[in-house]
Amino acid sequence: MNFKKEVALGIPKELPNKKIYDPNVNHAPIRENVLTREEKILALRNALRYFDKKFHKELIPEFKSELEKFGRIYMYRFRPDYKMYARPIEDYPHNSKEAAGIMLMIQNNLDKRVAQHPHELITYGGNGAVFQNWAQYLLTMRYLSEMTDEQTLVMYSGHPMGLFPSSKNAPRVVVTNGMVIPNYSKKSDLEKFNALGVSQYGQMTAGSYMYIGPQGIVHGTTITVLNAFRKINKNPKGKIFLTSGLGGMSGAQPKAGNISECITICAEVNIKAIETRHSQNWVDEVIDDTEKLVERVKNAQKNKEIVSIAYHGNIVDVWESFYENNITVDIGSDQTSLHNPWSGGYYPVGYSFEEANKLIYENPKKFKSEVKLSLKRHVEIVNKHVKRGTYFFDYGNAFLLEASKAEADILKKDGSFKYPSYVQDIMGPMCFDYGFGPFRWVCSSCKQEDLDITDTIACEVLEKLALSAPEDTKQQMMDNIQWIKAAKENELVVGSKARILYADSNGRIEIAKAFNKAIKEGKIGPIILGRDHHDVSGTDSPYRETSNIYDGSQFTADMAIQNVIGDSFRGATWVSIHNGGGVGWGEVINGGFGMLIDGSEKSEINIESMLFWDVNNGIARRNWARNKGAINQISRAMQKNPKLKVTLPNLVEDKLLENI
């Protein structure tokens, strides 16, 4: 059977052969068995409803075995035999070009070069899922191949609820992930609901079909590292950036360090993750001995090298070794998946990767205890380095939050954290308040020449806009022009032919309009526009994206909800809203979109309407929180567009409130 026919078939009419568990693939950690006997029966009943009754007797013991062995029912048997990667848009069976674009994006999220745990449908972050099981994937692809531009596919946490009549102006797909009643949003609730097969953690771009490989975060990481060095007034050359994690998102750190021209040391316990990044040229060297690492780093400091080193082992050992050997760490952070601390997101010091994974399911209580002890030790050594002059920041992975829960020495006397989130110090005031965020695009032709043309177009647009840019955004413009000029040389593409670029509202709109013109003229194929959820307007997250909101509203989620609703009727091809993402389940509400543009007048209208809202909604909220940069930026936006009317805050003098 050829690819198109297999996709259009969906769940096969006859049972495919069982799949052999492939030890060469990076698999998800075994999840804790949290279900009672009655709940296990319910999980099996839930899984079996995808299949004809005649197969139930054969599938029950198989699914029961998966549930007991892995803590989840993945339905490995139904993983398709065809290769999983982003194909040219015309290769997908379709009645709707927009639906074909979504199929391309889904397959990219599950490409083994891109996805962290492809056979468990996990794209990044340890538990960031596209689907809960392979039946959901097959059924979704079938619906997408059938649908027209007058239908909308509704996705409930990976489950395709069905095609519903809509209109050409409606989204083709509406995605929700992990939407639960607030009182049932604890991490233990997620484990139970996910094991039952009724909810999932979509992270950000995993469950919304907008992941573009580690490139998706490397630009933001580069901006963060560059501005961190600027903040401490140090030239990056010969200076150290110490961090951890080489997974789907964290794997961007060594590449970003090289682009920033510093010495990057990134610890990772999973050798497969290291091998993946090393083979992709995202990290230069691999060392598994702290003595050798110390020697190598001292030489790199002496020679002011630009080099990235993966240390195979625990980050705590590196911090302690550097302290003992008087190695100055200029910038420090952490990007382990601490949003998921009990299921392999963070590995305790003193255990090998294999030992820790075994402990997760054999003795989860002890594993949790060891993680907490490790976090205490981690914080203790970071505190010592900070006293020596290290600038340490939380990289939005819940490090500060989980360390505080572990009762580590991470709080000031007033109960606030000792260290800032990178959004508080860098990304918020320098980027988000001005509307700069991770705009991205994917060439649906999958041609390198199309990507090259879009790079050139984007650069030309930015250079033109930079000529009239206000002083408070000129540095951001210049950083992004330099980024796009060096993008191809830096070999950023893993998976689909995609690019990320931090741009403000005006930049995103003008770049997209220039793409649309090039499509109309036949220079390039259709383009899929999108962004990370980690952006100006898309995410309410008090420990990350909205951590530089100080009016008390950082714990509210009106912005993210308003954003996805607004995107849905302004021209988005698909929209998504998730519980969790970045900092973790119950801590965040975040959303995103995808928009296929095809050179048409309709695409032009959608670009101007939706991209304007998608950025300025967040600037308006940040302005109301009294953020100076956002007040300036939204005022400029109102001058440019007379239809925009935003409420500006009246600032009260501090002395008037001193005696209250």
Explain the meaning of each model-derived region.
Residues I271, G313-V316, Q335-N340, G396-E402, ...:
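Glycine-rich beta-alpha junction loops
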Residues I263, T328, Y391:
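Residue-level detector of anion-binding/catalytic polar loops
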Residues G202-L226, R230, P236-I240, L246-N303, ...:
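Catalytic or ion-translocation cores adjacent to nucleophile or general acid/base/metal-coordination motifs
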Residues E146-T148, F164-K168, N183-Y184, I232-P236, ...:
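Solvent-exposed alpha-helices and their adjacent loops that cap or buttress functional pockets
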